[in-house]
């Protein structure tokens, strides 16, 4: 390239450099604002050699709450915490999400269950009622399989539990690549994610409206768009189906009380694969289907979920308080 060619290109190179610098500054400021707006509100313990962020509330019967994908420990405690004030709630951020660190091999359900087990050994005095939403259901199922002494009952909300056919999205696959993956997680999620979040939240609540309307702010959805959280979630998604398949063959060995709560209109996790699969593999499980709910049955009717948790905490059986919440056969 001749000096003349270089001089002609120089304005474009300067402009491109300025735009890249502006984008970088914008991303750093956005990430700082997210963490100022939704700071860590729990305490930190060490689990599997890394820091684990755990939100705790109250005293009484102990209830573990494990959130799903693209989320954090605020989700379940925001839905149910004000109802369960006479119980001790333990709501960790799963590995790499929220404010928890991510140990090696953390995408495997066995490692995530071991991470939760380490937390429980430091925060719980005995076996807990374990509540899991979506992906969190797969984690607490593995917890019950690998660490049965820590769990007295399972409450599975819109559970992800079995292998499925659809492959991981291209964004999730690329996020794990060297260099290009890092470039992706540092640009697209922080810049574009907050604009797309309302559509994703609406899909989770469909067929009903988003309720509460400020759901994203209440649970700190923007925390997911930080690079480390997005990358961690992507890693989970890429091997998730295979991981669920490995443990699904063991479900029939579970003997503890299990309750499944699914939404009739769930378009995120298909009931025919997961809720029905659990009922087939764990015949003694009790299963409830909420007619007007999608992927968020604990928000659509928290009365049902509260009743189930209280029943398990007191070793009784919840049979439903309303005709619309009939137990499935």
How would you describe each model-predicted region?
Residues 1-61, 85-87, 126, 314-329:
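Alpha/beta-hydrolase fold catalytic core
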Residues 33-34, 189-253:
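Conserved alpha/beta-hydrolase catalytic His-Asp/Glu region
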Residues 145, 154-186:
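Flexible "cap/lid" loop of the alpha/beta hydrolase fold
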Residues 283-329:
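Catalytic active-site module of serine/aspartate enzymes centered on a nucleophile-bearing elbow/loop
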